[in-house]
């Protein structure tokens, strides 16, 4: 599946890993547009990357099921585990539950090792029929 990233994702320089993983992996490189305090990523950029990864995972899951829907994030909870440094940063999402009206998606953000996340997020998303 090819994802059309929204303008916000394009502004952050987010890319999609072309691998055939079950859930898309999104990434961005360290730059001035994602920097926070000297040498570290901005928390908002990390949150944005995880939100985009969660939405991509949910879109992928709904497409697999043949159930296209319009998505409206309702709540995003983020936990920062450690500071992100000046290197490529990745994120992916996992759909925990996708009902008829609501979906729950977890996202993880890492740099060197997916087993050592720099941040975790949980999104609640309203689903409505695609028009």
Where are the predicted features?
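Terminal targeting signals and extreme-terminal segments of soluble enzymes
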Residues: 1-131
């Amino acid at each position: 599946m090819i994802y059309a990233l929204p303008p916000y994702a394009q502004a952050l320089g987010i890319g999609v890993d072309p691998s055939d993983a079950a859930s898309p992996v999104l990434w961005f490189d360290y730059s001035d547009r994602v920097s926070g305090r000297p040498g570290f990523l901005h928390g908002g950029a990390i949150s944005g990357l995880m939100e985009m990864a969660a939405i991509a995972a949910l879109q992928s899951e709904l497409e697999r099921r043949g159930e296209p829907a319009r998505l409206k994030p309702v709540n995003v909870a983020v936990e920062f585990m450690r500071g992100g440094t000046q290197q490529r940063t990745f994120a992916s999402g996992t759909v925990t539950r996708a009902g008829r009206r609501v979906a729950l998606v977890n996202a993880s953000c890492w740099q060197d090792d997916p087993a050592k996340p720099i941040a975790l997020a949980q999104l609640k998303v309203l689903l409505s029929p695609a028009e």
